[in-house]
Amino acid sequence: MTRRTSAPETAGPIIEAGKNCWRQETASRFATLIDTADYFAAFAAACRNARQQIFILGWDFDRRERLHRADELDDFPDELGAFLVALVKHRPELKVYLLSWDFNMVYAAERELLPALRLRLQAPPRFHFRLDGRHPKGASHHQKVVVVDDQVAFVGGIDLSRWRWDTPE
């Protein structure tokens, strides 16, 4: 048996438009956000500038999480759910689409109960929140993506949720 010690020289690209992704685009800016403090600040800033739509996909979402924003100069609340609801109420053209995993009961002690119902009672009809429970047994909805006005995207491993807050310190 021969062991391979390096990748084959003929290896092609991993991502191929139309095959394993929709298309490829070039970003004019890119940054890595490691700490939740930086992510929440960038998320809040992007959302405050939103005019058309905000798409949020997450493994967990907790409307009670505080964004811990340094700039408390605007009139928007610091609590995540209230912040998003206020944005939608303030901007008549803005729509929010939020999809979160309908979690396993193992996580019930650390999750907010009935988040979709609570937000529906507060939010205008342009705020759409759904829980994803359609997946194989033992699986979960694990994407963590935010897209604002098709201009700014956050893709990675941080949920807009409790238990995620950290700083470089």
Model segments located where?
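A short, flexible N-terminal coil/short beta segment enriched in small residues
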Residues: 1-9
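HKD-type phospholipase D/PLD-like phosphodiesterase module
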Residues: 8-49, 53, 64-169
